Amino acid sequence: MITRVLITGANAGLGKETAKQLASNSEIGKIYLGCRNMEKALAAKLELEQLTGRSIFEVLIIDVSNQVSVVEAVQRLDCSVDALIMNAGGTGGKNFNKINSNGVTEIFAVNLLGHSLLAQELLKAGKLLKVAIYAGSEAARGVKEMGMKRPELPTSSEEEFAMVLFSKKHKMPLSHTVL
């Protein structure tokens, strides 16, 4: 049974809607809203509590594009989670090729590397018990700001394809369900 869930990118869009939908399940006892901005996270928490009538939401500040932030967030997590929904990410907007301090593009850092590190750190700490789901979607829709059309590929971006491969690699030896 899944009772505790961590959702990255949970202050808006699909992440917030996922939190709302999960809260409708009475078996869910805690939903960590993984967000990089405290003000937006607290606003989302308040809105979700009002919409659902449940006080099961807890803010976990995490910027998945920043390796230090990811490691520190896992250390601050006060208990294990049954499910990790890796939703944070995006397209990078007009600066999608900007190189970060780790020598990779911001879009690659947030859409793949950060989530990979998050899953690894949670597993290493014994804080991810059952399932990890990669839920990135921006590239699947295409982004007009970048002049992108909707892709016609089976996977919607290189980052998503890489995450699928990462997930498959870790599925068997860890005996966790990874979708």
Question: Each predicted region: which residue ranges?
Answer:
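Rossmann-fold NAD(P)H-dependent dehydrogenase/reductase core
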Residues: 2-179
